[in-house]
Amino acid sequence: MAKKKFSALEISLIVLFIIVTAIAIALVTVLATKVPAVEEIKSPTPTSNSTPTSTPTSTSTPTSTSTPSPGKCPPEQGEPINERINCIPEQHPTKAICEERGCCWRPWNNTVIPWCFFADNHGYNAESITNENAGLKATLNRIPSPTLFGEDIKSVILTTQTQTGNRFRFKITDPNNKRYEVPHQFVKEETGIPAADTLYDVQVSENPFSIKVIRKSNNKVLCDTSVGPLLYSNQYLQISTRLPSEYIYGFGGHIHKRFRHDLYWKTWPIFTRDEIPGDNNHNLYGHQTFFMGIGDTSGKSYGVFLMNSNAMEVFIQPTPIITYRVTGGILDFYIFLGDTPEQVVQQYQEVHWRPAMPAYWNLGFQLSRWNYGSLDTVSEVVRRNREAGIPYDAQVTDIDYMEDHKEFTYDRVKFNGLPEFAQDLHNHGKYIIILDPAISINKRANGAEYQTYVRGNEKNVWVNESDGTTPLIGEVWPGLTVYPDFTNPQTIEWWANECNLFHQQVEYDGLWIDMNEVSSFIQGSLNLKGVLLIVLNYPPFTPGILDKVMYSKTLCMDAVQHWGKQYDVHSLYGYSMAIATEQAVERVFPNKRSFILTRSTFGGSGRHANHWLGDNTASWEQMEWSITGMLEFGIFGMPLVGATSCGFLADTTEELCRRWMQLGAFYPFSRNHNAEGYMEQDPAYFGQDSSRHYLTIRYTLLPFLYTLFYRAHMFGETVARPFLYEFYDDTNSWIEDTQFLWGPALLITPVLRPGVENVSAYIPNATWYDYETGIKRPWRKERINMYLPGDKIGLHLRGGYIIPTQEPDVTTTASRKNPLGLIVALDDNQAAKGELFWDDGESKDSIEKKMYILYTFSVSNNELVLNCTHSSYAEGTSLAFKTIKVLGLREDVRSITVGENDQQMATHTNFTFDSANKILSITALNFNLAGSFIVRWCRTFSDNEKFTCYPDVGTATEGTCTQRGCLWQPVSGLSNVPPYYFPPENNPYTLTSIQPLPTGITAELQLNPPNARIKLPSNPISTLRVGVKYHPNDMLQFKIYDAQHKRYEVPVPLNIPDTPTSSNERLYDVEIKENPFGIQVRRRSSGKLIWDSRLPGFGFNDQFIQISTRLPSNYLYGFGEVEHTAFKRDLNWHTWGMFTRDQPPGYKLNSYGFHPYYMALENEGNAHGVLLLNSNGMDVTFQPTPALTYRTIGGILDFYMFLGPTPEIATRQYHEVIGFPVMPPYWALGFQLCRYGYRNTSEIEQLYNDMVAANIPYDVQYTDINYMERQLDFTIGERFKTLPEFVDRIRKDGMKYIVILAPAISGNETQPYPAFERGIQKDVFVKWPNTNDICWPKVWPDLPNVTIDETITEDEAVNASRAHVAFPDFFRNSTLEWWAREIYDFYNEKMKFDGLWIDMNEPSSFGIQMGGKVLNECRRMMTLNYPPVFSPELRVKEGEGASISEAMCMETEHILIDGSSVLQYDVHNLYGWSQVKPTLDALQNTTGLRGIVISRSTYPTTGRWGGHWLGDNYTTWDNLEKSLIGMLELNLFGIPYIGADICGVFHDSGYPSLYFVGIQVGAFYPYPRESPTINFTRSQDPVSWMKLLLQMSKKVLEIRYTLLPYFYTQMHEAHAHGGTVIRPLMHEFFDDKETWEIYKQFLWGPAFMVTPVVEPFRTSVTGYVPKARWFDYHTGADIKLKGILHTFSAPFDTINLHVRGGYILPCQEPARNTHLSRQNYMKLIVAADDNQMAQGTLFGDDGESIDTYERGQYTSIQFNLNQTTLTSTVLANGYKNKQEMRLGSIHIWGKGTLRISNANLVYGGRKHQPPFTQEEAKETLIFDLKNMNVTLDEPIQITWS
């Protein structure tokens, strides 16, 4: 409850009262004694009403009037400053006072260090030491010395007792007069044991007296009071002790920011007080005098408890020394020794008895607030949290339910119906009410007597004034009040009766007792006479308590209770109230445990009640500090403790409350509560997800938590446990207090800072598993950066423990009926243990009466034993263990057997095993409680875990398999499982060294011949080096290479930092494993293992490298270029070869490109990408493990991993490394026509004229190699001699022209051929190694003067008519110069062109010239052309080696720019890549414009310089469908300018319908070209078809041209930032798993969805509608579908197109070509989302200049829709062309159903009223701006209403 808010008048009166009181006291003392008042307080004159009853003055030594001789001070030289014991603790020191007290005066440069400290003349001497009662007894006589506070007691008695082997007590009392002692009901006198049987020795020094307690085992001194004097006066007791270490914990209640105490001269006052916790040392609600310390890494610890309830302070200084300064009572110390910190806590709790066993429902979540205002509000909060499915057991009401805040009443107006509401709560959970101790003295609201007060008066139950008979009147919430004296047995009877009577009205279930420090809003009492009793209310020494006034905000210190004066028992008020409430609960709920929550506590309070940490504030700091408070109360024996989640005072925030609810779900006591006047903060108010999720986990773990409370009750163990209790051998754990444990086994890591998703967390030395995934974490005894996004808290299970669980529900009543389960977290020895306690959850003495079930669990040797050690709770036997999850197994599980003890084991088939994460999940068990059971699991070798060890060409037999060392197991003919596979223990390399670095890891591997018994192809490399580099936080590299010899590495430059740049925020963790060797990469956020090569089969041989990795899911995409059957890879035992080849697309046929890159989606929705930078021939095998195996025939392993976390972000990260894609010119997005086999220029000219006449959009014309003379590059044939003039003509019309170039240069010419001759001069051609001989393959060029015979076979034609050609070596500098000149000369001397199409650059060869014949053979180096044993799974011609099939010989040589040589064997797959950039450079240097290069062969980074088409496809429906897959894949690979030849290259379609669909689909390829071949296909250009098809072609192409501004903007986004243009649905909707396999639909960017028909004879198409708002592009209408499959109508002339709500698409009216369309009006399509919001951008430039973005020569405009306002913002204006920026119309889609009557346009600083039309049924609104001269290069704003 909140601190009372005083008015300004009240504050003024209080201050005035204090001043007047102080003056009065001073005057009284001066007048009465004629000496200064300060001396009188130190030595008061005894009076009948001023003497504490506990300390009669007659036993005190009078204060001396003469100053004794000063004591001896230590020499200044070498004085131990930190050992000074302060001699003036009550005020700022002065030299005069110091000398008066006989102390040493030495000022210091720091005021926290005492300037005045004790000399050796204070204290006591010990005399008459005798042995008795298992201890010593001695008289201690005061050493004559000046007094500090007067009334020093001359002689005291020391009594020691060796109570137990690990507990020692010493007590110092007044032998002559009974002083006040704490009447603790559970602390019993002990008989003690002989000193010889203890763990400690005790030494008492006599002159001066001091006592030491020494641990026998190591002679460590645990307590040494010789460091300071003993002072013992009537109202001031002081003793100091030196501590054995700096690590101490405890004392309370206060706000301690850290669990370990700060030793730097800190004062902590202890005196119970109603005070708001804050950033200070104020005394708070409790009085806890216990502390403990740890001595060393052996765990040996100690504790000290002072049994004293008087006001005191403890002073801690760095030595370390603790000084107690106490205002009364006696000194009664208990010292505990334990072998561990946990043992010390257990021993302390044994002194005052262990905590009560809570009811099971007490562990459920509770919801409360101060001042709901009415029962209706409470009901609404309950309703919404129930509806949200929040696990929630108890609703609490604060004092606002009462009538005028009177106890045992309820407000019958605001809370009318409360009894019925309580009954409803019982049907769903529990109801808790608050009770304060203060009882109003006023009548009820209706004027009736307040019977609770009346009955209390009758029984004389109140705390009285100093006369012992007059009830003391204070003030609290009800107004003027009296206070029950709970130390009086009559009061306990009255209180129990009142509780019972009220329960008869309102059936509550538990009691929350508050304000019991005890709190009063007036100082002392209404009658101020008590405050004038100086010695109690103004003692000579007042500890550093808040206000420095003993009765501040409480009762007068001379008030009388049954146990004594308030001066002595004040701090016991809450403790005694808890005892009384416990007895009341026993009456109200006979034999039930109920629930008691108290604010004020004392040692032993946990036996009676639970505690919360008080009226905290909604702040991040207080959330953090709450962990220390929780851990401290675990020390104090109050394990059911927690802070108020989300904070009590001040408005919380959503983020703070979310994070606090995550933490609060793991407080032992979990409650959300806040104060009046502040915002609501119940879980359902902020949204249920995070709160519900973690409360559900809490409820799942309640059997574990309940068992921990059983152990706390039985053995005094802690529940919320600091690290040091479990990991005391690790000094890092001694200071950790931002994380904690549940018991020994659950690690909780909360987020305690705003805006943070990465937490610096310490992971102790154990095996840990992610609770939510079961995945084993690699961390151990290290500080890590734990990724915890907004909806996550860190939860980790400790290996070696078994956690009982239960299927959760929304209340414990419901959940207790659900099946039980076990989570077994195995340790390093594959062992674990655990326990379950189960009873009815509420009976008072179920443990004492043995009415419970107790299990112990253990695992060893692959066997889990569930041993029921006690069973006397019959009702519990209906429950059963149904599930068991085992984490951290090392081997796969083949079978499970289960059985009850002494019965036959039976096979159990209901289990799954996660091989990747080694998690066994067993379901459908039926282990009823009370029985004992065994579960055994047997290891297996799953088919899915078999990695083939015979990938060679040909079929293996059992003999060849076993000879190699493989395992053999025949499989059925239908199975793809390999019959030959690696043994699981296969481990040919030993990890010999590993070196973690801040920037990565390095390691060395050594071939281990005895283990390398499997002989893989070629010779193994003996020594390998592993290098892991942490590049940016979202990317890493790991590389395996020959440590002793340089091997070929790919000479392709990547954009990676020169030095790693990652920080502790990186998204991944990497481990290098051994036995077997492997690299593991985990995503920090989920713990998911996303790369795990710790698998059999790793090999690194000279010409055979193999590595396998597990995949995190079955969702994998990429690898190419190969025709795939779907976008998602089929992992059912498929192998795909990669080696660039002149191969038309076909199933499993390696084709033109080489892309060893994949992207994987993890089951959680995260994505990552992996690139293997290797250019040698390879294949990859997928298997359903899921796993992937790479095999390559050379180079090294050089992997790059991109962590995303979304598919599109992972793709962008990959593109950033390989280079962002080239920006095509605007015209390159237009429709393009080509054909292989144009006969002459006239045929092309006729086509062009027909297309223009039909007004079909069309931008680019091509010619294939037919335009050349005999297919010779840089020539024009006779039939095309007029082609240059035709090209000039159409270019004037705005058209563009692209010509083809193949790399092969003929060497058989009889006439001058400059291209060849200059090539010879420049030495540009590929040669045989170590010679000057050119390699002479044959390709397209024909021999001169040869007649072509078209009747012979292809091979015969190659021999008869094809010329010998030389291939330029594009790696050479000289070649780049030569190529640039040939292109330049051709452009300037023969014909103009705008782009270049480079073909046949795999490179393709039809054969090799050998001895006058074309043979598919090479000169030598058979191991290169026919790699030993293994060849990747590649397409070959019969009789050919895989490497040389349609390729140059592998031993031919290339020269790199640095002059080094490489073999075709290594760089074959780079040939096309090496040609693309020189071609683009030459094109741009020649034309001065951007141009475009289209390359058939590609490799990673090709997209930086060129586009690609999908090759020589077929006119089939199958190829149409496959084109979508290829287009999506090439976007992944960084080549967004991609398309297939529309309608195919080969074969006639046979049906016009295929053309209909082909042109519809092709209109939405980024690269839209038709290019059939003459020999196999009819003309397919639009004008070659009937009029209907022509119109349909025109219609769909006009849609494309309309959208080109949007599409061009998407190409710019990819060029500037990477990412896809043609986008899979999953890239935008990755959290919707339905999208993960879709490829027959695609997106343009984020906003435009294409759903084509790709099957014959269909007039409908079924497509998925992702979870967003979608509009039909053709109509603008909202289709009102989300997240479902839907069948759309698809007539032959229509393709389904949809625009995504929330986006704005810039468009432009179409025209015959882009040159003309760019001059038409722009328009905007504004598609509103469900919130009437949308955004979009437009990128504009001149469409053809080079590097416009890089040079700032562009316009960038941002559009935003907000409800009914559309604005544009010009972000960049480096390109100005108003003609191209004219805005003609704006189309608003999804505007809403209200009719629009008014619109305003603000443009150019003026307001306009634009004309508009609307269709209310479609919710569309169209603004016509054509007559308003609006251009987009200036901002606009349109509003409508």
UniProtKB/Swiss-Prot annotation:
Active-site residues (renumbered): 514, 615, 1399, 1402, 1512
Cysteine-cysteine disulfides: 73-104, 87-103, 98-116, 646-657
Membrane disposition: Single-pass type II membrane protein
UniProt cross-references to PROSITE patterns, sorted A to Z: GLYCOSYL_HYDROL_F31_1, GLYCOSYL_HYDROL_F31_2, P_TREFOIL_1, P_TREFOIL_2
Gene Ontology biological-process annotations: carbohydrate utilization; intestinal epithelial cell maturation; response to cortisone; response to food; response to fructose; response to glucocorticoid; response to insulin; response to muscle activity
Annotated region (Isomaltase), positions in chain: 120-1013
Positions on the Cytoplasmic side per record topology: 1-12
Domain P-type, chain residue ranges per copy: 71-120, 936-984
Membrane-crossing segments per the record: 13-32
Protein's cellular compartments: Apical cell membrane
Catalytic activity: Hydrolysis of sucrose and maltose by an alpha-D-glucosidase-type action; Hydrolysis of (1->6)-alpha-D-glucosidic linkages in some oligosaccharides produced from starch and glycogen by alpha-amylase, and in isomaltose
UniProt-listed SUPFAM superfamilies: (Trans)glycosidases, Galactose mutarotase-like, Glycosyl hydrolase domain, Trefoil
Region (Disordered) location: 42-81
Miscellaneous notes: There is a high degree of homology between the isomaltase and sucrase portions (41% of amino acid identity) indicating that this protein is evolved by partial gene duplication.
Name by which UniProt lists this protein: Sucrase-isomaltase, intestinal
Organism this protein belongs to: Rattus norvegicus (Rat)
Gene that this polypeptide is encoded by: Si
